[in-house]
Design a protein with these regions (language model features):
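Intrinsically disordered, low-complexity, charged/polar segments
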Residues: 37-83
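Short coil-to-beta transition motif at edge beta-strands of beta-rich domains
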Residues: 2-14
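Acidic interaction surfaces
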Residues: 14, 23, 79-82
């Protein structure tokens, strides 16, 4: 069964949690996070496998954890260059 996606809603698409910004004939555009260290605006192929719809609260929590993980990694990398 194919999941219908809608602008403004959040979905798990592959390894990404994405809030959909727009959809065109080739891409699904949105802001999302992948695993624990990558986040940003992205374009996924229109035929990407949508696993499930995600609640906005789950999406926000996931983005927040990703942001914290990125900040921690950034601090760790900077500490390597401190005297």
């Amino acid at each position: 069964m194919k999941t219908t996606i809608e602008k403004g809603k959040c979905y798990e698409i592959g390894d990404w949690l994405v809030q959909i910004d727009s959809i065109d004939e080739h891409h699904i555009w949105g802001f999302g996070a992948d695993s624990d260290r990558v986040m940003g605006f992205l374009a996924l192929p229109i035929d990407s496998q949508v696993t499930r719809e995600v609640s906005i609260n789950d999406y926000i929590n996931y983005i927040d954890v990703t942001r914290q993980n990125i900040a921690a990694e950034f601090r760790e990398r900077l500490s390597q260059y401190e005297e």
